[in-house]
Amino acid sequence: MEEDWVLHGSRPEDQKVGLISWAGTYLTAENYGNKITAVAKGLGRRQTWELIVCNEQDEDCQAVVRLQSIHGHILLPEGDGSVYCGWPRNTQHGYFLLRFHRHGKWTLQCMITGHYLESDGEDVFCNSRVLSAYHMWAPRPALHVHVMLYSPITRCYVRASPEQGCVWVDAPVPYLEECGFLLHFNEGLYHLESSSHHFLSQNDRLVSRPSQQTAFHLQLRPGGQIALGDGEGCLLYPQGSRALLGLGSSPMGGEEWFVLQHCTAWITIKSKNRKFVTIISELEVCARSERMTPMSFFQYESNANTNAIQLRSVTGQYLAQRSHRAVVGDGQKLEPDAIFCVSWNCGKIVLRAANGRYLGVTSNGFLIATALHPGPCEEFRIRLVNRPFLALRGRYGYVGTSSEHDQLQCNMDQPDCIQLLPCRQSIYHFQAQGGTFWSLTAYGTFRPWGKFALNFCLELRGSNLLAVLAPNGYYIRADSSGVLLADSEAITSECLWEF
């Protein structure tokens, strides 16, 4: 099982960062022309850069990289010290020597001129070979804040235990909600919040509130690898025979490094007979169980550009429908028989197999694709099993509250947690911080202090993307004004939310 969950390589989202100058402003690719500035105070799309790594970091703590903007252009320094975004003139143009420094800071030195990238708090230039504090950049992961941490050394995921008040590195498969964390950024430091809303402190315990004792320095390497420390030489790493995550000064063999991943979505599937789809042997898949077990959990893998999905079990294998047999649980990644086309309808889904027929449940509980057209027996309901809350990020930022507005906003730098209160499969109540509920105005806007719970329908539209159908029958979307609105009849790009 563990072999199947080892990570292979890095994904583009693992290489995306924001770069913060000494003045606390972000390196920004402006929409007009090819101009580069450093005036933005928050991390948005234009402040997100993808690291294109020419060679991996070495023992000298350096790597050779290019920086690519959200528009697909490369950050290019010129001999006169100016910096802009565009297309490289030759194979060497645009490469920087990336060096890693104390407290997680980076410097970027032009490979051609030897000049360091710097900012005066507004403009960006590259005209000095003498290293100073003005050349230091603090990287901030641009990954969604709901994350998992994977240890390549132990081959396990980090797991919080609120009952024991501590954090372990002992989960080979991250299907538990306790494997999900919120990585909060505040004034240059990071706080790790568990799914039970406790914070990891520097004394290795979970505490109820963030403080200086829960603030960590973050070191980031290309490929999404991070290390968290107290800034005085101690780092977090698994310790002892039970792999307790704690601060120490003697990590061995790189055990202080974790791969930062977006928290994956795990679901349960219920058939019309109200039974859970469950793997009951190595091959056999049935909808007979009235109780959830880990063998009823499936990781939802999908591409946002298609309606094709794969359902991965805790064994690391996939559900597959082969020839005229019932569904089995030993499918492989990208195997045609393990790919299903999903259609959504008011919280229910139907699954079309590779043979063009729809998946249904037989009288004895087996799953098989025989129906030419979907009916009630081919409908399934799903529920998120590792998400007690949502942190939604859309086109313009996170969904949250602002002291300057009554309505919920969709352009925030940090999210508000939306507690999910399930009432039916795929139907949830949205509870705001403080115990009140989301309320919907006549104008399609939202306020977070309602007295009564409303029904929201979640539709998964990608591995970590969803659309939300509001109580008024419209999809929730992000508006460029920053206001969250429920007024879209169809699902557009503004209706898709990372979660």
Regions found by a protein language model. Name each.
Residues 1-499:
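Lectin-like carbohydrate-binding module/patch detector with strong preference for beta-trefoil
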